[in-house]
């Protein structure tokens, strides 16, 4: 009994008053199986409650998204707004904010869009969707909040020497390589995934062999940091050229494979719509996470001029990454 916190005991007593007969109430509740059953009941009910709210959020999102793609901003806004009560339980709340703002803009409700953008800036300054909206440049206060949050983020940098060398060889920016390594392996050079991807940039052996043949480098372990990073950088540079510098598509290809991304045709919408329509949840999460990482590393780059830090987009022509169209020196 003494091991149970007082707050929990009070809650259990309240529940007991409603579900346990009067003659069985009292301290006996905190001994043996009755206590265990009550705690289990609370946990199960809480999980069901949370699941129900999140399911409602997902349902509202899907209905709103179908309306958005059909060109009906009013219906999309109605569905997304209907789920606002559930936002505290929805890990995708920043996404709802972003698309509600887009819908409000389409409907000419600029003041409401500004209010939503202000809330988004204060609540989710480091989220991918906030950074994406900041990149549009329509809300200076949001851009400033996102830039400030990026500069204040304590994102560690590791393997800088190896990353700089790979960047020089392949033309991929140091900040992009840092962002990918962070997401792929959390800077663990010994990381091996369940699918067999190895090292800092999580290369599959056959992908590594292709990259080795391009840059004429072999014989080293994929867990060698310098070797792994330069191979991964070469692979990413090739994907970036294949998809004509489209950053979200290149990142999606790095995660899911170039063949898969080639099947995901771009419709009439923009890059944000394309990201939302990526069929694989893991790849959607990956693309958003790496772009966020890249934005933060770019904002905190010691080589970046201080006066440029408040400017968004952090990467040129939102969604595009400049990598030399020519083959890198490592591939000649």
PLM segments and residue spans:
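Helix-turn-helix repeat elements of alpha-solenoid scaffolds
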Residues: 68-81
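Catalytic glycan-binding domains that act on GlcNAc-containing polysaccharides
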Residues: 49-63, 67-70, 86-95, 107-332
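N-terminal Lys/Arg-rich, disordered targeting/topogenic segments
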Residues: 1-30
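Hydrophobic membrane-insertion alpha-helices, especially the h-region
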Residues: 35-48
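Soluble catalytic regions of membrane-associated enzymes that act on cell-envelope
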Residues: 104
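Catalytic-site microenvironment of enzymes
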Residues: 27-29, 41-43, 332
């Amino acid at each position: 009994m003494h091991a149970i916190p007082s707050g929990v005991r009070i809650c259990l007593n309240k529940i007991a008053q409603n579900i346990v007969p009067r003659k069985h109430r009292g301290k006996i509740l905190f001994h043996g199986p009755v206590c265990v059953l009550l705690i289990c009941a609370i946990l199960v009910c809480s999980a069901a409650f949370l699941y129900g709210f999140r399911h409602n959020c997902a349902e509202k999102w899907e209905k709103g998204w179908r309306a958005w793609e059909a060109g009906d901003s009013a219906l999309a806004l109605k569905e997304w707004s209907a789920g606002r009560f559930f936002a505290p339980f929805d890990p995708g709340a920043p996404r709802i904010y972003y698309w509600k703002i887009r819908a409000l803009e389409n409907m000419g409700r600029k003041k409401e869009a500004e209010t939503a953008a202000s809330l988004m800036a204060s609540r989710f300054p480091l989220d991918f969707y906030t950074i994406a909206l900041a990149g549009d440049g329509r809300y200076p206060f949001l851009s400033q909040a996102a830039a400030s949050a990026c500069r204040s983020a304590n994102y560690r940098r590791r393997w800088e020497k190896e990353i700089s060398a790979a960047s020089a060889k392949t033309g991929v920016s140091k900040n992009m390589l840092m962002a990918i390594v962070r997401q792929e392996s959390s800077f663990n050079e010994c990381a091996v995934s369940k699918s067999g991807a190895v090292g800092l940039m999580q290369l599959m052996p056959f992908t590594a062999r292709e990259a080795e043949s391009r840059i004429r480098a072999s014989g080293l372990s994929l867990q060698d940091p310098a070797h792994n990073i330069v191979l991964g950088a070469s692979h990413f540079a090739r994907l970036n050229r294949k998809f004509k510098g489209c950053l979200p598509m290149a990142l999606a290809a790095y995660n899911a494979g170039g063949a898969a991304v080639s099947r995901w045709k771009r419709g009439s919408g923009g890059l944000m719509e394309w990201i939302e329509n990526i069929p694989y949840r893991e790849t959607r999460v990956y693309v958003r996470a790496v772009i966020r990482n890249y934005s933060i590393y770019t904002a905190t780059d010691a080589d970046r001029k201080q006066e440029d830090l408040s400017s968004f987009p952090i990467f040129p022509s939102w969604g595009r990454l400049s990598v030399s169209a020519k083959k890198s020196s490592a591939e000649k």
